[in-house]
């Protein structure tokens, strides 16, 4: 009888630890979505963040993290015949998340202008050199630091579309400055330009 009580109290303690661990994970995810993830960058990376209002074509691949606005992206799309924008999350490593470097290489191989735009600072400082400038959504105009919200608002401005922006569809294609569509895969976005 005493043995069963000891065993059940061990299970109770185990369940408490599992519940606490699960709660900690959920609350950290909640906090990351609610706080400005800029402060998760290392201090030396924070110094590399540069707000810019000029042409994207003038930016250099120099390890700086350039904050851009929707108008800069629209201007870039008007200046180039075929553009695919990749709305990427540097820390998002789930299945089917395309590496930003691979995206740039695939676009170059297909004669398409690549525009990878990060939607979060989380691990952005760990992205290896892309061959194009590292671009980040400047979220201040949207008066929110919640990445899901400012990402939707940013792409709504970029596309000039009243359609709902789905954050899981990470590729946006433009032909001669005209928004074609929002796609789940690079292949779908590329096909839309042909």
Residue ranges and their predicted role:
Residues 166-182:
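A short, hydrophobic beta-strand/beta-hairpin element that forms part of a small beta-sheet core
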Residues 85, 96-136:
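Structural microenvironment flanking redox-active thiols in thiol-disulfide oxidoreductases
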Residues 74-102:
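Short active-site neighborhood of thiol/selenol oxidoreductases, capturing the structured segment around
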């Amino acid at each position: 009888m005493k043995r069963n009580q000891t065993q059940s109290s061990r299970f109770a303690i185990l369940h408490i630890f599992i519940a606490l661990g699960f709660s900690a994970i959920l609350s950290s995810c909640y906090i990351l979505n609610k706080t400005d993830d800029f402060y998760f960058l290392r201090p030396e990376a924070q110094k590399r963040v540069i707000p810019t209002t000029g042409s994207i074509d003038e930016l250099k691949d120099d390890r700086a993290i350039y904050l851009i606005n929707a108008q800069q992206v629209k201007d870039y799309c008007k200046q180039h015949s075929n553009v695919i924008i990749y709305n990427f999350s540097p820390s998002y490593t789930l299945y089917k998340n395309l590496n930003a470097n691979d995206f740039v290489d695939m676009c170059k191989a297909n004669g398409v202008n690549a525009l990878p735009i990060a939607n979060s600072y989380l691990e952005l400082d760990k992205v290896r050199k892309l061959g194009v400038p590292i671009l980040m959504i400047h979220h201040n105009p949207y008066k929110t630091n919640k990445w899901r919200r400012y990402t939707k608002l940013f792409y709504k401005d970029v596309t000039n579309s009243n359609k709902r922006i789905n954050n899981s569809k990470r590729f946006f294609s433009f032909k001669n400055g005209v928004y074609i569509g929002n796609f789940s895969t690079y292949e779908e976005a590329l096909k839309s330009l042909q």
